[in-house]
């Protein structure tokens, strides 16, 4: 016999590793949001978000990037060849996202930011919640230690896949 949460589906999402010209990765500190399953204000992560019904993952990635960070001056460098899943901890299954999802199924993209840091805004568009309350550029090897533990295996896979492409622009 399986429990309800074992039968729950994964929320379709995208994730974005955004590089600046120096080869550093954009990370945001999770904003303190009520009922937020992914960590309140103490964890950092790369941008990610849901894919709308019938939306193409690449289009969703660019939309989510703009909604969460304000970044528009970008180019897509690569797409992860696989969909990656993570499960929520058992204490959050049935509570997070209205109890509808057991975790997320993510398609990751490597994005190069070609603009100026002044383009970043953490103020969300109308009707959206603030995702991050701070941001910075970080070296790739720092990411696993900064992310909430239940996402680390996904981050390890994303880093291993994209690391050969992470370098300063022009090198």
Predicted regions and their residues:
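Functional cleft and adjacent loop/helix regions within the main domain
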Residues: 43, 92-98, 128, 163, ...
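Charged phosphate-binding loop/patch that engages nucleotide di/tri-phosphates or the phosphate backbone
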Residues: 140-171
């Amino acid at each position: 016999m399986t429990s309800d949460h074992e039968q729950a589906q994964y929320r379709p999402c995208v994730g974005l590793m955004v590089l600046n010209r120096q080869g550093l990765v954009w990370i945001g500190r999770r904003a303190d949001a009520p009922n937020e399953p992914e960590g309140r204000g103490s964890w950092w992560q790369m941008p990610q978000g849901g894919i709308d019904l019938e939306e193409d993952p690449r289009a969703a990635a660019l939309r989510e990037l703009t909604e969460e960070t304000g970044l528009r001056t970008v180019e897509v460098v690569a797409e992860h060849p696989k969909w990656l899943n993570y499960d929520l901890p058992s204490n959050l299954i049935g509570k997070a996202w209205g109890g509808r999802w057991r975790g997320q199924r993510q398609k990751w993209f490597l994005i190069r930011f070609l603009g100026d840091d002044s383009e970043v805004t953490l103020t969300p568009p109308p009707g959206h919640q603030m995702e991050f309350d701070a941001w910075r550029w970080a070296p790739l090897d720092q990411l696993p230690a900064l992310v909430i533990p239940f996402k680390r295996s996904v981050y390890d896979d994303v880093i291993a896949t994209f690391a050969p492409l992470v370098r300063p622009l022009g090198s």
